[in-house]
C-alpha cells in the first residue's frame, strides 16, 4: 500500500497517539476507525434502530429544505 507523508502539530500527534489501542495500531488504523467512509443515512438509521422523534425531525427538515428551494427570490428587486 502506498504511503503519504503529512505534517501535523505536536498536539494532533499526541491526540492520535493516545487513541491507539495497542502498539500494533498504526496512525492510519486510528484515523480510519474514527473517520470511516461516508455512510448513507439509511445505514446510520438502521444501526441506531427505530426512533420516531428523529424520523419526525428528519421529515420536517426535508420538507423545509424543499420549500426553501421552491421559493423564488428576486435579488434585483432592491437595485
From Swiss-Prot:
Nucleotide-binding found in the keyword field: no
Organism of derivation: Methanosarcina mazei (strain ATCC BAA-159 / DSM 3647 / Goe1 / Go1 / JCM 11833 / OCM 88) (Methanosarcina frisia)
Q: What does this protein do?
A: Possibly the antitoxin component of a type II toxin-antitoxin (TA) system.
Q: Which UniProt keywords apply?
A: Toxin-antitoxin system
The organism's taxonomic lineage, starting at the top = Archaea, Methanobacteriati, Methanobacteriota, Stenosarchaea group, Methanomicrobia
UniProt record similarity statement: Belongs to the UPF0330 family.
InterPro entries in the cross-refs: Put_antitoxin (IPR003847)
Put simply, this protein is called: Putative antitoxin MM_2475
